[in-house]
Amino acid sequence: MSKNTKRFTELLKKIDSNKNYLMDEAISTVKTLASAKFDETVEIALKLNVDPRHADQMVRGSVVLPCGTGKKVRVAVIAKDAKADEAKNAGADIVGSDDLVEEIQKGNMNFDVLIATPNLMGLVGKVGRILGPKGLMPNPKTGTVTMDVAQAVNNAKNGQVNFRVDKQGNIHAGLGKVSFTQEQLKENMSAFVKAINKHKPAAAKGRYIKNASLSLTMSPSLSLDTQELLDTK
């Protein structure tokens, strides 16, 4: 048995596989699973009762986690003139227009989030095939296509999490670091679940959240009580 397999097996003993955990106990339990040599991320996974092949059942949006994500985020902004100045003053790491698009075309993407003003989306479209697969394409639904670039930069720097359901109806997100307090993780988790519930498509039928789990980067997952999640609004 490898060292990693043995570690994973030991962690499984701390989880009741027949139980659906309420948020408070789920958080306190995953905190006991920290075993890596780095500050692991607390991750939530949701299986939604939607069929994203239909446009009216797509779940996509963003939420600013009240206690942040614990990650340093590099933000790039495609803007000109006064809007470029606003972005710089708000703390954007990279600001440009044609020059920034040229760098992206060369494969130089030293940023985690890309924001653009609506009038320059035609320019951004030139590199859409590069940005899209990396999840970096600006989008109005995540607040990254906007004239309020200062607010968008602040959101990105202060814990904005973008979410989008995949083809199987799954959504994954990081809720912060395991070093966060119980209260911080609970606040972040509640905010994220509220956002998911808020984005429930009108066309979605039946039980919206089919199942859910919580884990750390390097830990097994535990099942969450979906009724509590559905009631978090």
Swiss-Prot record:
Transmembrane segments: none annotated. Pfam families: Ribosomal_L1 (PF00687). Disulfide bonds: none annotated. Gene3D superfamilies: 3.30.190.20, 3.40.50.790. PROSITE patterns: RIBOSOMAL_L1. Keywords: Repressor, Ribonucleoprotein, Ribosomal protein, RNA-binding, rRNA-binding, Translation regulation, tRNA-binding. It comes from the Bacteria. One of its GO terms (molecular function) is structural constituent of ribosome. The keyword Ribonucleoprotein applies. One of its GO terms (cellular component) is cytosolic large ribosomal subunit. The keyword Repressor applies. GO terms for biological process: regulation of translation; translation. InterPro entries: Ribosom_uL1_bac-type, Ribosomal_uL1, Ribosomal_uL1-like, Ribosomal_uL1/biogenesis, Ribosomal_uL1_3-a/b-sand, Ribosomal_uL1_CS. Belongs to the universal ribosomal protein uL1 family. NCBIfam families: rplA_bact (TIGR01169). Part of the 50S ribosomal subunit. PANTHER family: 54S RIBOSOMAL PROTEIN L1, MITOCHONDRIAL, LARGE RIBOSOMAL SUBUNIT PROTEIN UL1M. Binds directly to 23S rRNA. The L1 stalk is quite mobile in the ribosome, and is involved in E site tRNA release. This is Large ribosomal subunit protein uL1. It comes from Campylobacter lari (strain RM2100 / D67 / ATCC BAA-1060).
